[in-house]
Amino acid sequence: MAASRPVVLDVQSIHDFIQYVLDNHAVPSTLVVCSTKATFLEALQGEPQSSQDEQHAINPRRLWQTPTLRLLSTSRTLKLAFCPDITHLRAYLATYTITVAKRSVEQDDALRLPSAQPIMAILNPIELHRPTSAFSAQGLNRTFSVATEAAHHTGSKLVMADIAKPHAISNLGEELQTAEARAPTSPWEEELPILNVTTKRLGELSVGRTVKIKSVAERWCFFEKMPSLDSI
């Protein structure tokens, strides 16, 4: 089956993104998390809790007991991959065709939505690039290109999402702290330099021309609102 068009989902919750992937995937599918497992669990723990969760506070040991994460951890049809840096991410994507080929014997007897299909989901690619010199249109474009190619060659639908973090740019220097308060809610609306090179000049961060991350991603993906989980 031909892969559907790559998309970026406008989603505010990691839990919602995971549930979307679980509800819409078919064999073989993969959720690529752009962080370590520990950071991933920490982010899940730090998300606003629902009224039910507030009555039963989530702690690291109980995270995988929540319905969504229990399904993820026990799923035999959706693989989970952690890529803690750009090098690991690009290497994983470059060899994804081989990885999927080794999973050709997987069976899927579960009831699926008629629209279910193989999915390659990538969570927080922007955050992975942020603290590096590749946090630029050039760097992200290269990663998006490799991801799109991997999805195409495996007949998978590429689905990306980046969950906004209030402290996202706090490590870029004191001179950016004021700008942080004015930063857009969506990471995709953020401006970034076109090239990988950044230099300090006269006490300011010189990045040259900038472009929105969304404009970079639109070369490869369509942007879609996260559908209501009740309608899936």
Where in the sequence are the language-model features?
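N-terminal regions of ATP-driven nucleic-acid and macromolecular assemblies
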Residues: 1-232
